[in-house]
Curated annotation (Swiss-Prot):
Pfam families: Globin. Changing residue 15 to S: In a second allele. Involved in oxygen transport from the lung to the various peripheral tissues. This is Hemoglobin subunit beta. The modification N6-acetyllysine is found at residues 58, 81. Red blood cells. Heterotetramer of two alpha chains and two beta chains.
């Protein structure tokens, strides 16, 4: 998946990420760009407009929770399937989330990182993070296979 150099790069960069800001924005953008994903968050209240989604405190809080889990995965890049096994089971067996949504969220996360960090988020770092989000999405989808 990742070389030692790539792991070092993504891990060092992740230390700069403000999980609460980036998580809320990433989940919010997922819900705006891919509105069918909103069906999993009906209890979050008003998701009727982009502004409502992006300013919804429940979206922000859950986005932080998602990125807290992602942060844990960043500490276990060699065992993503093991790290995300319980979440895979939850999302498959109880929540019935389409595993394609994990890929969508990963791609949105990469967009948000690029937006927040600009030139510091180099093409090489983007490529490395694309590998990470793909690995996390595959780990979360593991229970479905």
């Amino acid at each position: 998946m990742l070389t030692a150099e790539e792991k070092a790069a993504v891990t060092a960069f992740w230390g700069k990420v403000k999980v609460d800001e980036v998580g809320g924005e990433a989940l919010g953008r997922l819900l705006v760009v891919y509105p069918w994903t909103q069906r999993f968050f009906e209890s979050f209240g008003d998701l009727s407009t982009a502004d409502a989604v992006m300013n919804n405190p429940k979206v922000k809080a859950h986005g932080k929770k998602v990125l807290d889990s992602f942060s844990n995965g960043m500490k276990h890049l060699d065992d993503l399937k093991g790290t995300f096994a319980a979440l895979s089971e939850l999302h498959c067996d109880k929540l019935h989330v389409d595993p394609e949504n994990f890929k969508l969220l990963g791609n949105v996360l990469v967009v948000v990182l690029a937006r927040h960090f600009g030139k510091e988020f180099t093409p090489e770092l983007q490529a490395d993070y694309q590998k990470v989000v793909t690995g996390v999405a595959n780990a979360l989808a593991h229970r479905y296979h």
